Design a protein with these regions (language model features):
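Extracellular glycan-targeting catalytic surfaces
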Residues: 28-218, 230, 234, 254-257, ...
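Intrinsically disordered, low-complexity regulatory regions of eukaryotic regulatory proteins
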Residues: 2, 26-28
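Flexible, glycine-rich surface segments
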Residues: 239-326
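Bacterial N-terminal signal peptides that target proteins for export
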Residues: 2-14
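Short, contiguous, pocket-lining structural segments
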Residues: 168, 197-200, 220-232, 241-244, ...
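Hydrophobic helical h-region of N-terminal Sec-dependent signal peptides
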Residues: 15-19
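C-terminal motif of bacterial Sec signal peptides marking the signal peptidase cleavage site
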Residues: 21-24
């Protein structure tokens, strides 16, 4: 008992000192000075890009490959296509339900309605891009126009001061941007309607995400989570690309490199470890900030990183390779632990102090084995495009193949998915 009390006193003291240091030291530290165990950050940070629409998570090359492989009925693309065609969100009979206000708060809200409608618009757009059937294009555009002409904001009259508005804006913003980017050249989408949509998505989602990344709603940046910063970053980047807005694109990239918060790559990683099983050779496993919180959020960050890095990559900025491919190391750690629901996986762990929730001393088994989309994108990029060893990401991609999308509500509705169809390389 005395030993345990002494341990708690030490933790409290260390945590207090850590918090004081992190909140009161120089601007250089606030901008993301790496912790001592981290590798040297690559100084060659790239802000030079070229936009060739469509270039969010999907490019025309992705669709050309998918069309060819589906027509050949080649695996695994044809299974991915059939998975899409089976989705309840990818049907012409889908009925969207635009809301005047998107609401999310601790008691619930209607944000899933927006998330599901955005997901449906994306899936319908993908069906059009691959099949050429214009009925799917018309259905996607109806959803986008309906929301742009109906919705006036996020938590703007209900719960205006609730921080859940960031989660609604962050996750739903990029979901609406993705199908709009695919439909931008569709002749059936009137220019004036597309312009209305671009103004709507900017006015509705950007200010909330911008405010959060700037001051974290007047709270300490280190008291947040990766899964708060990353969707805000992704929405800002996506709106920037959709609207050809250089300032927003550079804002999102700058936060990835140097942001004051857990979405900054320097702050996302809390430990570097050797693989006890020896499968990851010549590299390390990178422990992410939320591995000690729960696996629902830890696996959520995999997809968010995948979509953010893919969007940048499609513009010529290789964030996948940044800091010696550290995104791969993050994914390998997360995949290794979540491949099974069994709790006997040996996982090294660096204790991490969270200013609000205290010490995380081991990997959390909460929601262990959570399966989300994103693994196909990451596995194919690192293993097939770059030729790198990614054993745990590969195993997770194979486990989930053919990959669908998130359909269980809350943040999972934000998983664009269908990576087997769209990201499998030849």
């Amino acid at each position: 008992m005395k030993i345990e009390c002494m341990k708690n006193l030490i933790y409290t003291f260390v945590g207090s000192v850590t918090l004081v240091l992190l909140t009161s030291c120089s601007a250089e530290f606030e901008n993301g000075t790496p912790e001592p165990w981290q590798r040297e950050i690559n100084p060659n940070e790239n802000y030079e890009y070229t936009i060739k629409h469509p270039c969010l998570v999907n490019t025309e090359a992705d669709f050309e490959r998918a069309r060819r492989k589906v027509n050949e009925r080649a695996e695994p693309w044809i299974s991915g296509w059939e998975k899409l065609c089976e989705s309840r969100f990818a049907q012409l009979s889908y009925n969207a339900n635009p809301q005047e206000e998107i609401v999310r708060h601790s008691q619930g809200g209607n944000f899933n309605t927006a998330a599901f409608d955005a997901g449906a618009a994306y899936q319908l757009a993908v069906r059009w891009k691959i099949s050429g059937d214009e009925d799917y294009a018309k259905a996607a555009v109806r959803i986008l126009n309906g929301w742009a002409k109906t919705c006036k904001g996020v938590n703007y009259k209900t719960w205006p001061d609730d921080s859940h508005r960031l989660l609604a804006a962050g996750f739903i913003g990029y979901q609406f941007a993705a199908p709009a980017e695919l439909m931008r050249d569709y002749e059936g989408w009137k220019t004036e309607d597309f312009e209305v949509f671009k103004k709507w998505i900017d006015k509705t989602f950007y200010p909330i995400c911008d405010d959060f990344l700037d001051n974290h709603f007047n709270s300490s940046a280190i008291s947040g989570w990766m899964s708060w910063d990353l969707p805000a970053m992704l929405t800002i980047l996506s709106i920037g690309v959709l609207n050809d807005d250089d300032a927003k694109i550079k804002q999102a990239l700058e936060f990835f490199y140097h942001g004051k918060g857990m979405g900054c790559i320097e702050w996302s990683v809390k430990g570097m470890h050797e693989d006890p099983a020896g499968k990851v050779k010549g590299r390390h496993l990178a422990q992410s900030q939320e591995m000690g919180r729960d696996q629902g959020h830890a696996t959520l960050n995999v997809g968010l990183h995948a979509y953010f890095c893919r969007t940048a990559y499609n513009m010529g900025i290789d964030l996948f390779a940044y800091n010696d491919n550290i995104i791969l190391d993050l994914c390998e750690y997360t995949a290794k632990y979540n491949l099974t629901s069994a709790e006997d996986v040996e996982m090294p762990f660096e204790p991490y102090y969270h200013p609000k929730y205290g010490w995380h001393e081991k990997v959390s088994a909460d929601s262990k084995g959570r399966a989300r989309p994103g693994w196909e994108l990451l596995y194919n990029h690192y293993a097939k495009v770059k030729g790198m060893n990614a054993p745990y990401s590969q195993a997770f991609a194979e486990k989930e193949r053919p990959e669908g999308s998130g359909e269980r509500g809350t943040a999972e509705a934000g998983d664009l998915g269908f990576g087997t169809l769209l990201y499998t390389e030849e």
